[in-house]
Amino acid sequence: RDYYASRGLGDVYKRQGNDNLGSSLHGSYDAFGTHVMFNENSVKYIPYYLKSQDYPDVTWEKTVMKNIGLDFSLLNDRVNGSFDYFWNDITDMLGYANSNGLSMFGSYPINGAHIRRYGWDATLNTVNVTTKDFKWTSVLTLSHTNAIWKERMPNHTYNEYQIRKDEPVNARYYYRTNGLVNLDKSNMPSYQPEAYQKPGCPIIVDLNGDGLITVEDVDMKNVIPSLYWGFGNTFTYKNWDLDVFIYSQLGVDKYNDVYSWTSGRGLGNQTNNMSVYIKDVWHSELNPNGTIPGIAYEMASVSLPGGAGTDIGYENSSFVRVRNITLGYNFKPNQLGALSKLLSGIRVYVDVQNPFTFTGYTGLDPEVNTGGNYKGGKAEYPQTRTFSLGAKLSF
């Protein structure tokens, strides 16, 4: 019996350049909008000015793309798949630096940074069951990707708490919180920052346990999901077929912007409808067990060492979503009667998109992003659940 059918191993190396600053790297002159007349207005002089400088030492960005992959097939092709690992190095990245005083131009282009993007993709296709009337096949896909700074621009200014080596490009820095200061402050730790010592303020976590709140207590998360996966299944029984596809993103947080509509200080002058989250805002008399900071706390008006924010409003937005379920029936020619003269087959089906989502995220949708920032939302509209009924005619 042939348990091992085939395998293939390959690698790819590719290099390319990129000039994303356009014509700003090349010197040019342009005419002023006015001219000067000499010799009793008989001679016209058009003055020109230096519009942009030449920068002969500035080069294109360079991207080196490397990839290695493996394709395999087992059990007489009942199991086959692939695995690809890639890493791309982007060097001599283009940017701008401020010019010295009295310069004709406020900034000038430079090379300097280095980003590494890396990750892997895996696919597994299987034929699980095959009989005379029934067949079940599956496809599983897994993917992971990340991007880190190998080198920053020479003019980059680090915050005190920033990681200097291999910092994720999409890093988010924040102070962890652990509940709210109660009315008598009996649960407030001794190291609580002064600006956060009023009842209803979030309790800041001393991450390194030294009894102080400093930049050493700033935590970091990568806003790129740690894993994407999808799982599709197709079942066929005689003339019937059923397709179910599930996909997921894991290991990612997202800001639930509805929290910004629960500002305690904004309640007094709001005339529009408020979020139901307002019921969770801390209040010394009406809601002493509230979980959202009260009127004494306004994130924009108080700061922590280094200027990092907190995790207030951020939630784990990992999810598993049933993307679609499709059930169909195929009419063969011998079932069409008189229609068989015109048609070779008819398929009728019902389909539902986004019927189920499993997540701990309390906002409207853990995936949709309408706020302009990756994984940040502005009370986004959830993905639509749709139901369809259709037919496909084959002539």
Language-model-derived ranges and their functions:
Residues 1, 6-7, 11-174, 309-395:
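Extracellular/periplasmic, surface-exposed regions of secreted and cell-surface proteins
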Residues 20-25, 110-113, 127-223, 254, ...:
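Conserved small-residue
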Residues 40-47, 94-98, 204-210, 294-304:
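Active-site-adjacent bridging/hinge elements
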Residues 69, 214-216, 228-231:
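Short, hydrophobic/aromatic alpha-helical segments in well-folded domains
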Residues 74, 224-225, 293-303, 382:
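Proline-rich low-complexity regions
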Residues 86-91, 100-102, 248-252, 259-263:
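Active/binding-pocket-proximal capping segment
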Residues 223-256:
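Glycine-rich, aromatic-lined ligand/substrate-binding cores of catalytic
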Residues 249-347:
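Extracytoplasmic gating/loop element in the C-terminal half of outer-membrane beta-barrel translocons
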